[in-house]
């Protein structure tokens, strides 16, 4: 567990069903909100995002009364909200981006939320590298569709517009390298796609870039392609900055797998036929 993520682990609770959950009051303090009332608007925006994504708010935000000590023997009932992992993911997306701990929270809950789509975290750890690549590439494929929709709503209208929009995201994440430069750096042939020649770590960084850009385009009500391009670049740069702060390898420095995603998919199909 990364040291920047450890505080989120330390306040994690496990309910009777074995599900992970967090106290809104504890999370608010960890995220740098000195008073709970300042954190409430963030929770409200997260609830709205939950509802807009088609989820039931009560499934992820459970309001409770928690008895806390206020003296030697006295206790007082305080309102709190029990947050699911997905709720925490939405909360950190709607928090104050100026707070350094928010960046750590965004990476922590984004990674944890993606892993939850598998049976459990242990299953993800036990996957081989090629299985992780297939899983993350499929995730990225689906989220890129949602990113296209969000970009279109923001004013990115044509195929050329979208290519420029995508390049801004890559340039932010890859320290100025656009799609063509990344393609050349990987030594790929003209018909080979860069996303099909990324390892799991690089795919995870790009998945994070895509999901965060989609969220920010919607949250900020972006309504011009110039603004959308800037947003994509800024998110990519922020992901790069977070990788750097956590001591990770820059995306352009990661090794390029010799076996492509297409080859892995074909191997799976052959195995399934046997």
Curated annotation (Swiss-Prot):
Disulfide-linked positions: none
InterPro entries: BRO_N_domain
Pfam families hit by this protein: Bro-N
Domain of life: Bacteria
Loss of function: phenotype: A double yicC-dniD deletion in rich medium makes filamentous cells with little DNA in stationary phase, has no growth defect in minimal medium, does not grow at 45 degrees Celsius. A single dinD deletion has a similar but less extreme phenotype.
GO biological process: DNA damage response; SOS response
Alphabetized NCBIfam families for the sequence: PRK11525.1
Protein name: DNA damage-inducible protein D
The species this protein was found in: Escherichia coli (strain K12)
């Amino acid at each position: 567990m990364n040291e920047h993520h450890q505080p989120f682990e330390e306040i994690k609770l496990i309910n009777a069903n074995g599900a992970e959950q967090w106290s809104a009051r504890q999370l608010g303090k960890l995220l740098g909100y000195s008073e709970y009332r300042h954190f409430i608007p963030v929770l409200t925006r997260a609830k709205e995002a939950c509802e807009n994504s088609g989820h039931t708010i009560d499934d992820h935000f459970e309001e409770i009364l928690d008895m806390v000590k206020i003296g030697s023997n006295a206790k007082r009932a305080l309102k709190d909200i029990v947050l699911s992992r997905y709720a925490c993911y939405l909360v950190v997306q709607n928090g104050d981006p100026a707070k350094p701990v928010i960046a750590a929270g965004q990476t922590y809950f984004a990674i944890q939320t993606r892993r939850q789509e598998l049976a459990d975290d242990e299953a993800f750890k036990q996957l081989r590298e090629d299985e992780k690549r297939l899983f993350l590439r499929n995730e990225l494929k689906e989220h890129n569709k949602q990113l296209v929709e969000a970009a279109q709503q923001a004013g990115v209208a044509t195929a050329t517009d979208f290519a420029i929009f995508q390049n801004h995201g890559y340039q932010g994440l890859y320290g100025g390298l656009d799609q063509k430069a990344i393609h050349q750096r990987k030594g790929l042939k003209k018909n080979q796609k860069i996303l099909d020649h990324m390892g799991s770590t690089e795919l995870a960084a790009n998945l994070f870039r895509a999901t965060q850009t989609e969220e920010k385009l919607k949250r900020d009500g972006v309504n011009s392609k110039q603004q959308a391009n800037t947003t994509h670049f800024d998110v990519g740069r922020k992901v790069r900055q977070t990788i750097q702060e956590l001591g990770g390898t820059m995306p352009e420095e990661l090794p390029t797998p010799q076996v492509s995603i297409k080859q892995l998919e074909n191997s799976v199909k052959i195995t399934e036929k046997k």
